[in-house]
A protein has these predicted regions:
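Thiamine diphosphate
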Residues: 1-169
């Protein structure tokens, strides 16, 4: 099953949605794929997952930016970047451990397969901090105020996608 906020700009949607889905489907694998800024909107809810032994998996695509905001600024506002980058991020592995969850980090693409298996095989809540290219864009993208049929599908030429970005596809 797939749940999404559908490009509505609902930063922070994924973590509480994952908790609700895990309660509704306790035997299913539930993975929240989100950026680090989205997770920080309500990170405290990981305590709910730990308290109720909900084995949700939080897979953070960590580029140290509000990724979609940075991407809008790049593609739609002539690279006029404003307030979308932060150096003041927590160590998500330590944060997971502080809550009593499992923390995993992947720094390079060659680590992904093994660490994703570790995440999936855990019977506890997991925060997976996946460090990604800071300038990699995420597609498809629905520009602010546009309908779904006007989504941006990405560079027409694959040469515009970094090797790190291709690894995640």
């Amino acid at each position: 099953r797939w749940m999404t906020s559908g490009g509505l700009g609902t930063m922070g949607y994924g973590l509480p949605a994952a908790i609700g889905v895990q309660v509704a489907h306790p035997k299913k694998l539930v993975v929240d794929i989100a950026g680090e800024a989205s997770i920080l909107m309500n990170m405290q809810e990981i305590s709910t997952a730990v308290q109720y032994r909900l084995p949700i998996k939080i897979f953070i695509l960590n580029n140290e930016y509000m990724g979609m905001v940075r991407q809008w600024q790049e593609l739609l506002h002539d690279k006029n970047y404003s307030e979308s980058y932060t150096e003041a991020l927590p160590d998500f592995v330590k944060l997971a451990e502080a809550y009593g969850a499992v923390g995993i980090r992947a720094k390079t693409p060659d680590e992904l397969d093994e660490k994703i298996k570790e995440m999936i095989n855990s019977d506890q809540p997991v925060i997976f901090d996946c460090l990604v290219d800071k300038q990699e864009n995420c597609y498809p993208m629905i520009p602010s105020g546009k309908p779904h049929n006007q989504m941006l599908l990405g560079p027409e030429d694959e040469k515009d996608v970094s090797d790190e970005g291709k690894t995640l596809v």
